[in-house]
UniProtKB/Swiss-Prot annotation:
Molecular function, one GO term: uridine kinase activity
Alphabetically ordered keywords of this record: ATP-binding, Cytoplasm, Kinase, Nucleotide-binding, Transferase
PANTHER family, per the entry: URIDINE KINASE
Any single GO CC term annotated in Swiss-Prot or TrEMBL for this entry: cytoplasm
Disulfide bonds: none
Enzymatic reactions: uridine + ATP = UMP + ADP + H(+); cytidine + ATP = CMP + ADP + H(+)
Binding site for ATP: 9-16
Pathway the protein acts in: Pyrimidine metabolism; CTP biosynthesis via salvage pathway; CTP from cytidine: step 1/3; Pyrimidine metabolism; UMP biosynthesis via salvage pathway; UMP from uridine: step 1/1
Name recorded for this polypeptide: Uridine kinase
Length: 206
């Protein structure tokens, strides 16, 4: 059976950075990002901040669970893709064929018990709030077409509250907590070595 490694943490904590670095070392691992399971806002004009992207209900949780369950059963899936500029799901999907170990990353992947039960190793990236905010600000402005004002307003109105209400409490479910995500070379080396061994030797660790 496929082993699923979950990497969670607040927005800007360094999840994607760690995953990208792991992928450079171990390219045979498949990555599934929870970001692709955001619900479409719709094809109409709206006030962006009326949509709370920092709440579990912002995700298509049923689809996320069903597809992870298929991955766990070594079945291929067609993963959705999300357009963060237009805030809707794209028409195209990506075919994902499971590898022995699959990495799943996202801010709320530990929120639902049914999803947690599918994850064999739970990793939480614990990064200071100011660092996370700066990273989120840079990312949203450079890659998601956001303005400085909109990012700050969203952070103050929903992101900060969502982190303390939904994300930080899931730290208690983690098997491993990594501080300073994305810039912790020692932790990255240990994690990469472990995943490489796991991919070769299978389920001996679980």
């Amino acid at each position: 059976m496929v082993k699923i490694i979950g990497i969670a943490g607040g927005s800007g904590s360094g999840k994607t950075t760690i995953v990208n670095k792991i992928s450079e070392v171990i390219p045979e691992f498949v990555l599934i990002s929870q970001d692709n399971y955001y619900k479409s806002v719709g094809d109409y004009e709206y006030e962006f901040l009326d949509v709370n992207f920092d709440h579990p209900d912002a995700f298509d949780n049923n689809l996320f669970y069903k597809q992870l369950k298929k991955i766990k059963e070594n079945k291929l899936i067609h993963m959705p893709l999300y357009d963060f500029i237009n805030h809707r799901r794209k028409d195209e999907t990506v075919e994902i064929v499971p590898t022995p170990v699959v990495i799943v990353e996202g801010i709320m992947i530990f929120v639902e018990e049914r999803v947690r039960n599918l994850i064999d190793l739970k990793i939480y990236i614990d990064t200071p709030n100011d660092i996370r905010f700066i990273r989120r600000l840079e990312r949203d402005m450079s890659k998601r077409g956001r303005t400085l004002e909109s990012v700050i307003e969203q952070y103050l109105s929903t992101t900060r509250a969502g982190y303390y209400r939904f994300i930080e409490p899931t730290k208690e479910y983690a098997d491993l907590i990594i501080p300073e995500g994305g810039h912790n070379d020692k932790a990255l080396y240990v994690l990469s070595s472990f995943l490489r061994t796991l991919g070769k030797e299978g389920a001996d660790f679980f």
